[in-house]
Amino acid sequence: MTTTTTAPAPAGTTVLDASGVTMRFGGLTAVRGVDLTVNSGEIVGLIGPNGAGKTTFFNCLTGLYVPTEGKVSFKGTVLPPKPHLVTQAGIARTFQNIRLFANMTVLENVLVGRHTRTKEGLWSALLRLPGFKKAEQESRERAMELLEFTGLAAKADHLARNLPYGEQRKLEIARALASEPGLLLLDEPTAGMNPQETRAAEELIFAIREKGIAILVIEHDIRFIMNLCDRVAVLVQGEKIVEGPAEVVQADERVIAAYLGTPFEGAPGKEEAAEVEAAEAEAHSTTEGDDK
């Protein structure tokens, strides 16, 4: 079980390049020709009203969905449409709904995230060969480093289900970092958090950026995202309507209209948005069923 790591790309290097990504569910289009790049050491935000296609776009990036059109590249290589291969390539993510192993310890949850970086085979593990033992110790040391980094080291032996909500969110991030990603995707990392927990999450994300890891964040907390991100892209009914620095995005009339519920020219109606949300939910439940 030898371990491998992925070195961070040099600052400013494009790590994610999504080009013309479109995702259809039957006759409904949830994502429409979206282009987006993320550079190493950069935090990019993705915002939009409910039904905008944000999580569907994330699922296209991580191999949960195969885009109907377009392509997704990581460090210049087109990604295979398989989540475990995407993780192995260097992309990790968290989810809207916490997906921890509730009855495993905090440390064990992080060790699960190391599986794509261990290379020893079945026989080495069964026979407890020296190479396996060495790699296992290296993984434990790395997992403890991540728990120190996220402020959870003192609770390494606690069951994940016994952590406060904000710390469960931190644990999800620690587990994602265990795969040594070059790009971290965070799907609503502050959902359900109080202001103190939100501030702690912000500080943690900045600290991750300092390690040279690129970060793409979906979030409904507009103040949080505008304070956090170098760039912000806005999706409305699957289309990217604007992208730029926070101050540019905040002043854009189309963004204001989308969040205030005022229709602008060419904007799909509420009925279409509701249909897209329903299609996304159905596809998500189907995907979860296939994974079990």
Q: What positions do the PLM features span?
A:
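Glycine-rich phosphate-binding loops of nucleotide-dependent enzymes
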Residues: T2-K292
